[in-house]
Structures are given as structure tokens and as C-alpha cells.
Amino acid sequence: MLNFVVIFTGGTGGHVLPSVSFGNYLIDNGYKCILITDARGKKYTNQFKGKVKIINASHLTGRFFFKIIGLVKLFLGFCQSLLFLLKLRPQIALSFGSYASLPPSFAIKVLKKFIKLNFYIHEQNSIIGKSNKYLIKNANRIFVNFEKDYKLQKKYRKKIHVVGMPTLIKNKITYNSDLLLKNNKKFTFFLYGGSQGSIPILKCF
């Protein structure tokens, strides 16, 4: 099928929500798009307009036993992804990072030996995550959010393209300068954190 894109994502909203936004953009512009994620990431996909495929995935953290369990889940996710992608045969695959993107991305690495497709990475953070680092070698392009030095080897730097962050927010957020001036005698500061850091930061205050 022409114009068929699969997107790999998972874990936290920081990975999933931008992928949902970009996937919806593709669908609105005539592409077929399927999202592959894990059970944890699925809760952020309610606004996605296409099909969502759930696979097994896990972090490799904790004690030895839990790392073994994690490896088993990643292998199962790889097998699920390989069978699913063999059936679909997309032209384009795009990873938005997280541990859940590893199984389908490794499946793409295998499939690229037999079918023609392009594989891309989008990195949302100022430091490239572990999952995306593993995949850089096999990526045709690396899309990033910030214009900065990502400390990559010279042979990979030419793959980088600054595109910014896909977002579900349609309207710009503006501040009320009059409100700030009314309270100019009070010391005011703004706290902002990601999905893993915002609650702990706010609890400190």
C-alpha cells in the first residue's frame, strides 16, 4: 500500500503524545498510519485517529530476575512486531523513542534486508535517549527538537534535521501581562516538568 507509515512509541506521554500528533497529521493528509506501542503507552493514544497495535515491551532495570523478565518481554515484542510488519509491509517506519520502540525497530532492521523501506527517528529531548541511540546506525534520517550539538559521531551528524516537536495543542498559550503586573510585589516563579518529573517537583513546593 502506498503512503503507509508505522510509528513506534511507548512508555510516557513525552514519547506517545508527539507520535499521536504526527500520526494524526499524516492521516489528515491522506496517509495510512498505524501506531505500535506497549500497554503503558496505550493510555495516551485516545486521540489517535488510526489503528493502535499493542506489543510486549519492558525496561531492563532492577534485579537480575527482573532483567531476564524484561528481555523475554522484549523478545516477544520483537516476534510480534516482525509478524505484524511482515503482514503490513509499510514503506516508512518512524521511531519516537522509549524502550517500547526497540522491538519493532529491531524488526525493521531485519525487514530492511528483504524489503525496501525507510526508517527514521524523532528525538524529543535535548539528549538522545538510549533506545534511539541504539537505532541511529540504521536510521535514514534523525529528526530532532532542538538545534544543538547532540554529541554524535561525525558520520551520523549529516542525518540530523531540526523539525521541532509535534504537538496536540492547536492554540498558542499566552500569558496575561496585566495579571503579572498586578502581582509584581510578590516573588513569582514557574515550575515545569515532564511526565516523570512534574509531580515530584511540585510536591517539593
Briefly describe each language-model feature range.
Residues I7-V20, I199:
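A short, glycine/small-residue-rich beta-strand->loop->alpha-helix junction that serves as a flexible
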Residues L2-N3, Q91, K185-F187:
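Nucleotide donor/acceptor-binding cores
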Residues I36, G41-G50, I173-F205:
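Donor-nucleotide binding loops and adjacent catalytic segments primarily
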Residues V5-V6, S81-A100, L117-H122:
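Short N-terminal targeting/anchoring amphipathic segment
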Residues R40-K43, P90-K112:
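An aromatic- and histidine-rich active-site surface loop
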Residues L2, I7-G10, Y25-K73, V163, ...:
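Conserved nucleotide-sugar phosphate-binding/catalytic loop shared by glycosyltransferases and other
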Residues R63-I92, V110:
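An amphipathic, basic-hydrophobic alpha-helix
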Residues K32, L111-Y175:
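Active-site-proximal region of nucleotide-activated glycan assembly enzymes
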